[in-house]
Amino acid sequence: MRNREDRARGGSVAFLALAACVAVVAGGARADDVAARSWANVVEDDRAIRIETEQLEAVIPKNSPKQWMTGIEKGTFLDKATGFREVGDGLMVIDWLMEPGSDEEWPDEILGQEGHGLHRYTWFANETDPARRDYALMAHGSSHRKRMVEGPQLCHRMKPVRPEVIRGDDYVAVKTTYQFEYAAPGRKAGSTWTQLIVFPRGERYFVLMDRIDSVNDVDELILRNDTPGCVRHERGDTFSEMYLSYLGGPNGVRIPSSEFFEPFPPDLKFGYRRDQNRTPEHFIRAYHLRDPKTGADGPWLAGLTLEPSVVYEAWASQRPGGIIVMIEEIHGKPTKAGESFGAAHVVGFFDDIPSMHKVYERYKGHTGLEVDASGWRLLK
């Protein structure tokens, strides 16, 4: 009897020990899972999605934005290491699908009212009022006319969206899609824009892709955006200099903020056109943040377009009203209905210019981005 009881007690002890080990392993796995996800916090409500990592904060609007829809919301992109934020109207905001050419012959009766529906591009030749003509020259210059292919201008007129939040062990991603709602004469509406934003663990930047799935045949189809974003300033109070890697030779050009004290059109200086400029090794646009209260320099905020050849045109022009517009247009190539094109970018905070180029070398040559259960990856 005693032997049976001893064996029973021994079996019970062994079972309990095994159960304890299983519990420890399971508990450890759960703890590891919690730890893996604790580096990033995602808060979503009816208006927006807020992402907070160990390095960054950012908000992606769903509706009722502080300034523009698409991309990262105005003033929300925070570098925790330095306390500096983006100082424009948001990051990587999207305009519309365009092509070179004139819209003067479009009949007035097909145009929308007060910015809603199809409208002509703001161009000096379309304007009779002197003030409007001057604004058009400052906004878009006079040398490379364009027109809308499909609208609306998403940053201004996009309806509320429901982005998808995707989480992995080493990333948080947000995916937004939208179909263009109206089109120019002879075109169809319905091309799809997709923006995928990935926040990798441990980085002071995000990786972003814009992709277009076209429903039209267009000889030079263009997607326009702001890369990384516009700059708001009063005589250089928020930034000390700008860096453009694609101008001024192989090392790029550093431009003091004083060059942006007075308005100038985009085709006067600091412009890039693929048909007129050498395609650079790296395509980087960055501004050096400055504390407006103390004048002390902070980090650089940079946008890296990872395949330079996709850039069709880019400018950094000072408009009236204290804003530098950082337009970047991609693709500008023959596109058939059913075809797709896109660009991939890295946008974030950097301590210096060499660190931008180091990250560029790590990711260069890519135009696409995808995520799944195994992680995130750039695509060529």
Where are these regions (language model features)?
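N-terminal secretory signal peptides that target proteins for export/translocation
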Residues: 1-10
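Bacterial N-terminal signal peptides
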Residues: 14-25
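Boundary at the C-terminal end of the N-terminal hydrophobic targeting segment
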Residues: 26-31, 36
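Polysaccharide-binding surfaces and accessory modules of carbohydrate-active proteins
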Residues: 33, 207, 217-298
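Beta-strand-rich recognition/accessory modules
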Residues: 45, 52, 263-380
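Acidic-aromatic substrate-binding/catalytic surfaces of carbohydrate-active enzymes
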Residues: 46-181
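Broad, structure-driven detector of short, well-ordered beta-strand segments within folded domains
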Residues: 55-62, 82, 190-198, 298-306
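Acidic, contiguous internal or C-terminal segments within carbohydrate-active enzymes
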Residues: 73, 162-235
